[in-house]
């Protein structure tokens, strides 16, 4: 917690090709060691693969995938009298987006073989079709929230 008050959130600039802030955030999540041009190559390459495989606009497929991956509920730990309860809470819109993108990239990296372009494209296509690791992660998160519904009154 900063002593000097609230820290302003940085505005992410839209990417040069699709003019989308969401794509820009995806590029930033894929980026390692500050190598942004490499991350852009990976993302745009993945989008080209998506266009080839689906025959649809890759931005539409990406938006659909994000909507299928973004969680609505999550559990947060809360200590009450020596016991820690998992309290279900709604996820703020900015956090929903960042979690969705984070899970897409995380599960794309976990896929076996091939290049990162192909893995990212495959994960986005799977997520758009409501399958894949990132969608399973969202469903697990929702199941946890549903299972701990009894502790919802501990919200803060």
Curated annotation (Swiss-Prot):
Q: Would the keyword Ribonucleoprotein be found if you checked this record's keyword annotation?
A: yes
Pfam families in alphabetical order: Ribosomal_S7
Q: Which CDD domains match?
A: uS7_Bacteria
Keyword Chaperone found: no
Q: Which InterPro entries match?
A: Ribosomal_uS7, Ribosomal_uS7_bac/org-type, Ribosomal_uS7_dom, Ribosomal_uS7_dom_sf
Q: Which GO terms describe its biological process?
A: translation
Spell out the GO cellular component terms annotated for this protein, sorted alphabetically and separated by semicolons.
small ribosomal subunit
Q: Which UniProt keywords apply?
A: Ribonucleoprotein, Ribosomal protein, RNA-binding, rRNA-binding, tRNA-binding
Q: Which region is the signal sequence?
A: none
| Molecular function as annotated in GO | rRNA binding; structural constituent of ribosome; tRNA binding
The record's subunit annotation is:
Part of the 30S ribosomal subunit. Contacts proteins S9 and S11.
Family of the protein in this entry = Belongs to the universal ribosomal protein uS7 family.
Functional summary from the UniProt entry: One of the primary rRNA binding proteins, it binds directly to 16S rRNA where it nucleates assembly of the head domain of the 30S subunit. Is located at the subunit interface close to the decoding center, probably blocks exit of the E-site tRNA.
Protein name per Swiss-Prot or TrEMBL: Small ribosomal subunit protein uS7
- State the species of origin: Thermoanaerobacter sp. (strain X514)
């Amino acid at each position: 917690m900063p002593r000097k008050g609230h820290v302003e959130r940085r505005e992410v600039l839209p990417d040069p090709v699709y003019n989308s802030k969401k794509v820009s955030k995806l590029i930033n999540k894929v980026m390692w060691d500050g190598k942004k041009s490499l991350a852009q190559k990976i993302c745009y390459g993945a989008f080209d693969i998506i266009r080839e495989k689906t025959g649809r606009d890759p931005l539409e497929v990406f938006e659909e995938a994000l909507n299928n991956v973004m969680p609505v509920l999550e559990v947060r730990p809360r200590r009450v009298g020596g016991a820690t309860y998992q309290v279900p809470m709604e996820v703020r819109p900015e956090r929903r987006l960042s979690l969705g993108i984070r899970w897409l990239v995380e599960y794309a990296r976990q896929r076996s073989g091939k290049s990162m372009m192909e893995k990212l494209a495959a994960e986005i296509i799977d997520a758009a079709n409501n399958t894949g690791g990132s969608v399973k992660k969202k469903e697990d998160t929702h199941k946890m929230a549903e299972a701990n519904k009894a502790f919802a009154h501990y919200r803060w």
